[in-house]
From Swiss-Prot:
This is Alanine racemase. It catalyses: L-alanine = D-alanine. SMART domains: Ala_racemase_C. The active site is at residues 34, 256. InterPro entries: Ala_racemase, Ala_racemase/Decarboxylase_C, Ala_racemase_C, Ala_racemase_N, PLP-binding_barrel. GO terms for cellular component: cytosol. The keyword Isomerase applies. Keywords: Isomerase, Pyridoxal phosphate. The keyword Transmembrane helix does not apply. Its cofactor is pyridoxal 5'-phosphate. Gene3D superfamilies: Alanine racemase, Lyase, Ornithine Decarboxylase, Chain A, domain 1. Substrate binds at residues 129, 304. Homodimer.
Amino acid sequence: MNLLTTKIDLDAIAHNTRVLKQMAGPAKLMAVVKANAYNHGVEKVAPVIAAHGADAFGVATLAEAMQLRDIGISQEVLCWIWTPEQDFRAAIDRNIDLAVISPAHAKALIETDAEHIRVSIKIDSGLHRSGVDEQEWEGVFSALAAAPHIEVTGMFTHLACADEPENPETDRQIIAFRRALALARKHGLECPVNHVCNSPAFLTRSDLHMEMVRPGLAFYGLEPVAGLEHGLKPAMTWEAKVSVVKQIEAGQGTSYGLTWRAEDRGFVAVVPAGYADGMPRHAQGKFSVTIDGLDYPQVGRVCMDQFVISLGDNPHGVEAGAKAVIFGENGHDATDFAERLDTINYEVVCRPTGRTVRAYV
């Protein structure tokens, strides 16, 4: 019996993929599976996504891209975080597309002795993170166009404010992106497959789908914009087994610093999940867990290995071994948990680590 588990519902992943594929229409569907498929386990998740409609996969690092090939993913794979100093030749040999995110990246690929290299140019259209800056566009485009072994499959950019559908910055970025695309084609780059839509843009701006869309979070069943509902099914549940139930007297405290004290005689329970497992220490007093459909507030400081919940006078007889849902099925969803912690659901599903055991259902 595992004390701390993330349950991953692969049927939910399959369902979400089918929903997104239908929404994509004629556009290709790229599944972003970086960070171990948003902490859902890429070895199990990616094949399910591949089998239910994904045309391509997107990852951050070379290691993530190579892992997809190792587990048998045959679709196109795009890697967008790498450096010219890395050994990227193995990725080229395994037909992995590499993002050109700066002139230095373009130069490294142009100078690589390879018969054929597939690249996608990342444009910095306003996020001001990675991507080719406007003053660099012409030089990069002309250099890539002159390299016979380079195939530019397309261009992409990342939107800064897509989770705010009314924010005008998105349209400003699209104008810049289209300007870059026109300039690239003027220099002889066909750029047949282009994409700008992350999950929020994909779900709120169908006019921006272009030739491909690039959602990530939505595959895991979470909505990226408050108030949206697209019939997605959350795939992750984080749950633990209560390890101890004990009585506490009025005025007695619990956990380090005794920062919480019981107002009345009652019971507390220990849940074996701490900051070493991804539960942030600053979550003290901000959330509750669900046991048999009832909420119990977290009290006192979150420790490295455990936290405490108040059972009141324990009218429902919670005992050691009871299942405490931190978020997910039969409990608060990841978005609600994130709001209580003043963060986003993207971060919340990436948090369960440490001694957490992943189980697939």
